[in-house]
Amino acid sequence: MTIGLSCNALKYGGGLERYAIDLARGLADAGVRPLVFARSFDSSVPEYQCVEPRRINVSFLPGKCRDAWFSWRLRAARRAAPVDVLIGCNRVDSSDIAICGGTHLGFLDAIGRMPTFSDRRQIALERRQYARARFVVAHSMLMRDELRRFYGLSDDKIRVLFPPVDAARFTPVDAVRRAELRTRFGFADDEVVLLFPSSSHERKGLPLIEAILRDAGPRVVVAVAGRPPERTSERLRYVGYVKDIEDGYRAADFTILASKYEPFGLVGVESVMCGTPVILPSNIGCCDAIAPSAKLVFAPGDAAGLRGMLDEAVRRVRAGAVRVESGAAARAAIQYDPSVARHVAQLLDLAAEAASDRRNGGR
């Protein structure tokens, strides 16, 4: 069975780019060398050696036309390859297994925006993608609900598979190593540090967090990792782009987000696997994957609720009831198997079923 993988780019990045890299590596470990269809490839990453690259050029087109062109060209490219089962990690209407790491209608609903002409084009492509796929893999219960509500999909088409996380990378450290990391990031021993990893501060809720921070107790700090915030202060600090983000999690006391829309939020799972609990709104998809002991949850946009959770976080830090140093205990707070191997095995099972359906005359 020849497996194809479609993505915007095969490179180290965030979101579905990172997910595609994980799949390429996991498929290689399972003895599968996929054909990867993408707009661009980073040939320097190790995973590039694990795939058969097939570039679909979109660089000559305006940005808003590229999704539709890529999807159109992919139909012919998969036939020519040929590919038995295509896993689509971007908006394409010829995938057998469509990966849903977010929906455009769900995003617009969450931020309260009416669709533009460009939005409607993206939504139409999404509808075709989900309608034509044999399976749609939802990366969270939230995505499953959006697929039902906005796209009318039935449960027999949807499979909920939480995304994988590198368990070898995201692990706790002992107290000595953690103290070294806090020194590296400039965190004082008596500070309560809330890590805010983000490249999209408005969507991730930084304005709400800033407003609450003004009323927080002394020595409470929000450390922004990623894109620089518009302003900083003694309480709102910028620690730069942290490539080894696992060390940022380990140095902090909590990781915090107040996102308006977050289909899953790998940040939450990664942080907990590093032994650091999280403060999250209930609309973040990963809340369903984290044990109650490792999270403080508030209603989306609820300033009073966030203030209460922040007070509770400070109380726990001052009482020494926060950190987890045992890898086993950290993994136990994640309520699914986050390994890449397990996730890929589940996808290969779906691929076998989709291939069987195609041979028998189904989609």
Curated annotation (Swiss-Prot):
GO terms for molecular function: glycosyltransferase activity. CDD domains: GT4_PimA-like. Coiled coil: none annotated. Keywords: Glycosyltransferase, Transferase. Disruption phenotype: Disruption confers resistance to cellular contact-dependent growth inhibition (CDI) CdiA-2 of B.pseudomallei strain 1026b, but not to endogenous CdiA. Alters lipopolysaccharide structure, decreased binding to B.pseudomallei strain 1026b inhibitor cells. Pfam families: Glyco_transf_4, Glycos_transf_1. Its EC number is 2.4.-.-. Belongs to the glycosyltransferase group 1 family. Glycosyltransferase 4 subfamily. Probably a transglycosylase. Probably involved in synthesis of the outer membrane receptor for a cellular contact-dependent growth inhibition (CDI) system. This is Probable transglycosylase BTH_I0986. It comes from Burkholderia thailandensis (strain ATCC 700388 / DSM 13276 / CCUG 48851 / CIP 106301 / E264). The lineage of its organism: Bacteria, Pseudomonadati, Pseudomonadota, Betaproteobacteria, Burkholderiales.
